[in-house]
């Protein structure tokens, strides 16, 4: 687990991401670290750059989690984004409920992959999510964020090494580039 904390800490503290405002938010949140995503067919603008918008179905967890109050669409605060909504935040976990069975004991090991044309990543970190349904007592949320965008709000080039907890074969897994 220390290796996971160290890796995530290194990613969060690297490069341009250092200028962001990371805070611990203690509230319900969507944990998208082990989710895949699919295109909505729309675009989303981050720091003046248009990206393809992706949607990920993510389990809602409780407790302290890290958010970037200057990133995503958090607008400076951990305050709830609205009625029926939560933020997509990050909390290291060995097990994360995942589609299709949403079993809370599903292992979610860290893995890396290299992006390729048409096989990138999605960034849901610190974007708002809409609560949907419960499956096997796990509350789910639809989270919307950009494809191939870094934590610092810049494009991810093809050939970038990425870390994720999504299973091998996941479409546009939620993750972040390694420095």
Question: Regions from the language model: what does each represent?
Answer:
Residues 1-8:
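Bacterial N-terminal signal peptides that target proteins for export
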């Amino acid at each position: 687990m220390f290796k996971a904390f160290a890796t995530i800490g290194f990613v969060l503290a690297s490069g341009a991401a250092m200028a962001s405002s990371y805070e611990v938010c203690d509230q319900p949140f969507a944990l998208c670290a082990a989710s895949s995503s699919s295109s909505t067919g729309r675009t989303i603008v981050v720091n003046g750059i248009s990206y393809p918008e992706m949607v990920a179905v993510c389990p809602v967890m409780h407790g302290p989690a890290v958010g970037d109050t200057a990133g995503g669409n958090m607008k400076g605060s951990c305050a709830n984004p609205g009625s029926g909504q939560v933020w997509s935040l990050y909390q290291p976990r060995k097990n994360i409920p995942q589609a299709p069975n949403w079993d809370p004991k599903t292992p979610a090991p860290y893995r890396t992959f290299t992006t390729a044309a048409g096989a990138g990543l999605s960034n849901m970190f610190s974007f708002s999510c809409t609560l949907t349904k419960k499956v096997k007592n796990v509350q789910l949320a639809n989270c919307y964020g950009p494809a191939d965008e870094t934590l610092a709000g810049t494009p991810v080039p093809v050939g970038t090494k990425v870390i994720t907890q999504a299973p091998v074969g996941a479409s546009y897994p939620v993750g972040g580039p390694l420095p």
